[in-house]
Amino acid sequence: RWKDLFFSPKTAVILPDEVSWRGFEIRKGCRPCERTDCMEAGEPQPLVFSIRHYLKKIQSFCRKEGSQLLLLSVPSPKNWNAAKHQIVSEYAREEGIDFLDLNPLTQDLKIDWKTDSYDGGDHLNLSGAEKVTDYLGEYLKQRYHFSAPSAGADVRDSWKAGLKEYLEQV
């Protein structure tokens, strides 16, 4: 998870397995968002050095592992705007990295900010996350080649157990 890059093991908070979900949180609540335009104009600002630095580290790691990096922004009218889109687009273009911004696609995704927002437009709730996941899954299948994982039985069992637990919770 990207947030792990910014915290040392001494300061990191370890979440219990039941809320971790490998970076996802099941958020069933809903607080509607009044502002629905994710692409409002904003003041352009340069990409902060620390973000650029860690993106370079992530890129290097992906290359070393033979993986292709995809920068992704999920719908968030509270935290996203056209200026941020432009900055990330420029960085991705300069670095030859794919960038998928779902903010301009909220109508295609059928995001309803009255029902799909957990906290007034900052995060999606379960309903919104499922819509994004469906779209993202298709996007990845169409554009990237995935081979069967070579993980051991313990890893596969862990994912199967996680899926079972997730399905029970939702």
Per-segment meaning from a language model:
Residues 58-82:
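Active-site segments of SGNH/GDSL-like serine hydrolases
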Residues 4-25, 70, 86-92, 97-103, ...:
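A broadly tuned "polar low-complexity/structure-edge" signature
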Residues 41-48, 72-78, 117-123:
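Second-shell loop/turn segments in exported
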Residues 54, 83-84:
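Residue-level preference for nonpolar/small residues embedded in alpha-helices
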Residues 33, 37, 42, 67, ...:
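Amphipathic, alpha-helical segments enriched in basic
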Residues 1-65, 151-170:
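Secreted/periplasmic serine-hydrolase-like ester/acetyl group-modifying domain
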Residues 84-157, 161, 167-169:
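C-terminal regions of proteins
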